[in-house]
């Protein structure tokens, strides 16, 4: 992934903020790729990555048999911090976006649905919390 960042006209504070944002974006993309690979290794078919609806985004949508799984990926220095970063409002947006995905995919109607939280820590290790609710 190549990202061009223009920094010559920015203040030092703005450049630092932009660099943190770029690092966070790259870290998030690496975490999502790691989790996607793990779901594939477990026999899941990946239907979509970073699927955007009108009200939000779902990081990963996979199918295994009659089960459809909507996965939110969180990365942080620690598992606890990553888990705590998922808010009720964010989970609600993910659920609403999942419903929009299903509205646009009538061939998937009737499948069982689940929401997972994949938590990736700084070392790259991760855990999947299956069937999350708040």
UniProtKB/Swiss-Prot annotation:
Molecular function in Gene Ontology: nucleic acid binding
Pfam families cross-referenced by the UniProt entry: UPF0102 (PF02021)
Domain of life: Bacteria
UniProt-listed Gene3D superfamilies: 3.40.1350.10
InterPro entries on file: Restrct_endonuc-II-like, tRNA_endonuc-like_dom_sf, UPF0102_YraN-like
Coiled-coil stretches: none
Alphabetized HAMAP family for the sequence: UPF0102
Family statement: Belongs to the UPF0102 family.
Name assigned to this protein: UPF0102 protein Dshi_2830
Organism for this UniProt entry: Dinoroseobacter shibae (strain DSM 16493 / NCIMB 14021 / DFL 12)
Lineage, highest ranks first: Bacteria, Pseudomonadati, Pseudomonadota, Alphaproteobacteria, Rhodobacterales
